[in-house]
């Protein structure tokens, strides 16, 4: 092997190792950012993941009582209306880390009307940590929190032919592909539409089959919420839940291999706290 060939071989091997590392390094939200880079990332609208990275770093600083995090609070309020769903979702979580943040309470209340199921849910979870005008826990987002315990029905965005579907029982991330739909057009020239899950969880039911023709608004699938989502909802309902929420909570109290112990235990705690509050009322 010549020296030139050997060098090319080692260079190729080095790149095979380096490029995945660089990709991981640039997308890993745990990488610490200096203050100046956080400021730059928050304004990088061309790279939403940069904004998310900065938001996660700010959230961690708030949790560690780092007073320097307050310099970015106006940015957190601004990002509540960012066009990218993932940014708004992360932002809603971060604002819940400081209930004294100027403008946070008002921004989160507005986010309860967001077009995204997950953004509404995260805003509601954060609001449960705030106090309302009477000094009680803010229960404004309670309906959205209860909704986090319910399956989500995925609908066809338009008429067309189903060309592919995921399998029942498959775990799926938020944004994961549930089915593909070939739009019903005279020419058939439009590309297939990827129908994605609005939440992370598990596919409970596929309501159609490959090759079937569906109308706009037809149900494609039902997604059961993920364990983490349910657990967080139970924690919030422990604080603000009411007696009418118990029917949504109690299915998670049963012993089942599909329900992790931590979720079941949190459901039981929420149930107990709700009944205790109800019995204390005059």
Locate the predicted segments by residue.
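Hydrophobic core positions within HEAT/HEAT-like alpha-solenoid repeats
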Residues: 54-55, 91-92, 109, 123-124, ...
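A structural signal for short beta-strand/turn segments enriched in small hydrophobics and glycine
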Residues: 169-181, 211-220
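Short inter-helical turns and helix N-cap capping residues of alpha-solenoid HEAT/ARM repeat scaffolds
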Residues: 46-47, 83-84, 115-116, 226, ...
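Hydrophobic membrane-insertion alpha-helices, especially the h-region
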Residues: 6-26
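Structural signature of alpha-helical solenoid repeat scaffolds
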Residues: 59-60, 96, 128, 238, ...
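Residue-level detector of extended alpha-helical repeat arrays and alpha-solenoid scaffolds
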Residues: 51, 88, 120-121, 230, ...
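Short beta-strand-turn/beta-hairpin segments enriched in glycine/proline and small hydrophobics
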Residues: 146-162, 177-201, 222-223
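Amphipathic alpha-helical scaffolding segments comprising HEAT/armadillo-like alpha-solenoid repeats
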Residues: 2-3, 28-42, 64-80, 100-113, ...
């Amino acid at each position: 092997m010549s020296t030139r060939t050997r060098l090319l071989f080692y260079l190729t091997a080095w790149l095979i190792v380096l490029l995945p590392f660089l990709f991981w390094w640039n997308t890993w939200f745990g990488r610490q950012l200096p203050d100046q880079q956080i400021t730059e990332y928050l304004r990088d609208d061309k790279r939403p993941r940069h904004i998310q990275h900065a938001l996660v770093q700010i959230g961690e600083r708030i949790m560690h009582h780092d007073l320097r995090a307050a310099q970015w609070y106006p940015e957190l309020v601004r990002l509540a209306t960012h066009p990218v769903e993932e940014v708004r979702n992360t932002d809603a979580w971060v604002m819940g880390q400081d209930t004294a943040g100027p403008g946070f309470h008002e921004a989160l209340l507005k986010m309860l009307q967001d077009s995204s199921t997950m953004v509404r849910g995260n805003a509601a979870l954060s609001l449960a940590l705030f106090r309302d005008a009477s000094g009680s826990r803010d229960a404004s987002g309670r309906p959205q929190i209860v909704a986090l315990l319910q399956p989500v029905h995925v609908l066809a965005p338009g008429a067309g032919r189903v060309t592919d579907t995921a399998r029942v029982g498959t775990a799926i991330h938020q944004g994961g592909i549930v089915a593909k739909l070939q739009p019903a057009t005279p020419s058939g020239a439009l590309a297939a539409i990827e129908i994605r899950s609005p939440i992370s969880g598990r596919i409970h039911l596929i309501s159609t089959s490959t090759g079937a023709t569906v109308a706009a608004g037809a149900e494609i699938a039902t997604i059961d919420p993920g364990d983490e989502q349910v657990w967080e909802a139970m924690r919030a309902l422990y604080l603000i839940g009411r007696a009418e929420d118990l029917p949504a909570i109690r299915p998670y109290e049963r012993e089942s291999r599909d329900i992790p112990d931590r979720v079941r235990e949190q459901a039981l705690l929420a149930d107990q706290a709700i009944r205790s509050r109800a019995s204390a009322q005059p």
